[in-house]
From Swiss-Prot:
Keywords assigned: Antibiotic resistance, GTP-binding, Nucleotide-binding, Protein biosynthesis, Transposable element
Name of the protein: Tetracycline resistance protein TetM from transposon Tn1545
Organism: Enterococcus faecalis
Residues at which GTP binds: 10-17, 74-78, 128-131
UniProt-listed InterPro entries: EF-G-like_DII, EFG_II, EFG_III/V, EFG_V-like, G_TR_CS, P-loop_NTPase, Ribosomal_Su5_D2-typ_SF, Ribsml_uS5_D2-typ_fold_subgr
Gene name for this UniProt entry: tetM
Organism lineage: Bacteria, Bacillati, Bacillota, Bacilli, Lactobacillales
Amino acid sequence: MKIINIGVLAHVDAGKTTLTESLLYNSGAITELGSVDRGTTKTDNTLLERQRGITIQTAITSFQWKNTKVNIIDTPGHMDFLAEVYRSLSVLDGAILLISAKDGVQAQTRILFHALRKIGIPTIFFINKIDQNGIDLSTVYQDIKEKLSAEIVIKQKVELHPNMRVMNFTESEQWDMVIEGNDYLLEKYTSGKLLEALELEQEESIRFHNCSLFPVYHGSAKNNIGIDNLIEVITNKFYSSTHRGQSELCGKVFKIEYSEKRQRLAYIRLYSGVLHLRDPVRISEKEKIKITEMYTSINGELCKIDKAYSGEIVILQNEFLKLNSVLGDTKLLPQRERIENPLPLLQTTVEPSKPQQREMLLDALLEISDSDPLLRYYVDSATHEIILSFLGKVQMEVTCALLQEKYHVEIEIKEPTVIYMERPLKKAEYTIHIEVPPNPFWASIGLSVAPLPLGSGVQYESSVSLGYLNQSFQNAVMEGIRYGCEQGLYGWNVTDCKICFKYGLYYSPVSTPADFRMLAPIVLEQVLKKAGTELLEPYLSFKIYAPQEYLSRAYNDAPKYCANIVDTQLKNNEVILSGEIPARCIQEYRSDLTFFTNGRSVCLTELKGYHVTTGEPVCQPRRPNSRIDKVRYMFNKIT
């Protein structure tokens, strides 16, 4: 059986959850249509999603049609950072991008389409809600061509009120765009030679799967118009991005979820091989897990299974698998699955409104952060404050809503601040010797640091021979340095430098790896004091799309938000501004754009990198460590 995984994507209120229900109903997977208004849909399965009528977490269901199983991944529709979009789309074989016939292409539609093209996912446009009054499809087509892609092929005729029906075009009516995009076919056509239907279909299929041609279909999910035809299109046009005939197992965890009974569930997309119940499965070079229970979605219901094939999505109840864990051979992952999640850019302090709910809050954050790698938290051991790190405002708003509506915890939140990094200013060396006060550890360590270009990260090397200092001591030094890099002179992560372990001494009767592990961060702090550090702040690259009449305002406002516009383009009465902006300023700039363009602007952002800051350094309190802080204090007193 053929297995394909598709995503249903759209801007808010375009009807994507309703379309999913219609696909399930028309294929026979369910016997009664669910309703977003009544909160009875299959895919918006949390109370928060049903109450708000939006999709917050990736939901999965399926149907079977003829010899094809279709897993539908109803992906989130509220995303404020492209990395979040990429993560949720990476498991798809294809996508249906909904466009409301009444509203046309919206800002969210453009963000989603941008991500689909970048990742390389074949996409069908489905114009929904054609049964509403006042529809002008020619305007919608023009909107798609101007804001998404001109490379579309209209596959159907539509009769609006009062007949309300959708019919496939005849062969000759739908091939113009296919012919125009191929020089060989165009020359053959203009010379009067007969074009075979097979070669036209093959050309359309090639361009569709290369993401250079986008078929357009029509219907009404609510009133079940055009859905049967869409099911045929889905099962015929899409194919699975799996390794056919490859026996080696490869799968990736793309979602972690907690059931109502607090069971931890890992969702896995299989890319090759067969997964059997009770199989020992490698998840790293040294680690294996045993499959004791396995589920998949069959006709909209979760069912236990004994084995799963390449292309399938399986669900395991497991405490050890993490988001992005790979089962089996990593080399068999598709290239788009190798996109790394960025670090959070913002942080804030959260506390429960009712102090007695503190443990409930911590338990809830543990589950939420486990499900979302772009959300992190820790408890400051000195102040006992709960520090939450995240990427963007919408993510924070959804987290607050989840805490209140799913976990019944109300919180108080402070204004978010940017997460900075630190880089050494110059080369420096420092050594702390054994038995020289105030060193209480049975170890000598000498380190050097040197700045590297922005974006290099931390590079570590040891020039101390393994013949002299064995691997366990060397590992301890590296672990201590890794810990020390978490807090530089101003309390931020240290990056973009080369750290060299240049000197080590131990006393064989008494020295232990713990001595080296404890001493290393103290030596690192002293060598950083000698080198000095500078603060780096995150910068985003942005691309703004806005009506041409707002060019002057958008351009002139940029310096107010420290934005640097590097390119300006005019296209189809629309201005496209590209540039860079500090992460701390993007939310205000984006809000301002939305306000003065009346919601007609789109702002796409991605992490560009880190730039050196100017002005007074921003400090954050150091996290205490009872085992080394007294020694740190004594060394800081004498240096």
